[in-house]
């Protein structure tokens, strides 16, 4: 067995800006998304080459998820932003959502429904409707749907993790208060 190291150069000695924050696979291609503090690098694991670098312009990336189609990426940051990237359009965000009042800890796409969610240290979970069109000339439509409140903020930490049900519109959130909450429509 052999291990690949396509991101050997992402870390320089003593620099936290290059330390890996989170990783995610592309749903259909042999691509790996590697988020460092300020950038998201997309590597082709077969070619062992850098495909592109996303430049969100945030201070610190906290979380990342790839749309089931593989053409879109959302990321959360500790400076309260959720950003949507269209991989076919640009390396800069298509849309920046600034609805949270504290650091964003988690973002997640629903595997089959046009939904995504973000969780933050303000103790809230924001749910969005995201319509992705097959027409390449039409941009994605992002609509905030609901703010879910229920987690208590503990020592400046709120909601830490999110998970969608594979087929139903059910969302589970885990908070620093020690609770896991199931959200249903």
Task: Label every PLM stretch briefly.
Residues 1, 40-44, 82-86, 107, ...:
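WD40-repeat beta-propellers
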Residues 4, 47-49, 89-91, 132-134, ...:
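Short coil turn/linker residues within repeat-based beta-strand modules
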Residues 6, 13-20, 55-61, 97-104, ...:
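WD40/WD-repeat beta-propeller blade N-cap
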Residues 7-10, 51-52, 92-95, 136-138, ...:
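A structural motif specific to WD40 beta-propellers
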Residues 23-29, 65-70, 108-113, 163-168:
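Loop/turn segments within WD40 beta-propeller blades
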Residues 35-37, 76-79, 119-122, 174-177:
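Conserved strand-to-loop turn within each blade of WD40 beta-propeller repeats
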Residues 160-185:
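Blade-level signature of beta-propeller repeat domains, shared across WD40, Kelch, NHL, RCC1
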């Amino acid at each position: 067995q052999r291990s690949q190291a396509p991101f050997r150069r992402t870390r320089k000695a003593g620099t936290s800006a290059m330390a890996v924050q989170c990783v995610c696979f592309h749903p259909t291609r042999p691509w790996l998304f590697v988020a460092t503090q300020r950038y998201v690098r997309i590597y082709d694991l077969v070619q062992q080459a850098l495909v592109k670098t996303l430049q969100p312009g945030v201070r610190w990336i906290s979380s990342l998820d790839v749309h089931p189609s593989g053409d879109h990426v959302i990321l959360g940051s500790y400076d309260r932003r959720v950003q949507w990237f269209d991989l076919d359009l640009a390396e800069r965000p298509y849309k920046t959502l600034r609805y949270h009042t504290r650091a964003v800890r988690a973002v997640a796409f629903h595997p089959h429904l046009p939904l995504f969610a973000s969780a933050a240290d303000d103790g809230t979970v924001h749910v969005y409707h995201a319509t992705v069109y097959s027409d390449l000339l039409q941009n994605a439509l992002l609509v905030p749907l609901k703010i879910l409140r229920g987690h208590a903020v503990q020592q400046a930490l709120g909601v830490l993790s999110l998970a969608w049900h594979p087929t139903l519109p059910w969302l589970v959130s885990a908070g620093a208060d020690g609770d896991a909450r199931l959200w249903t429509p």
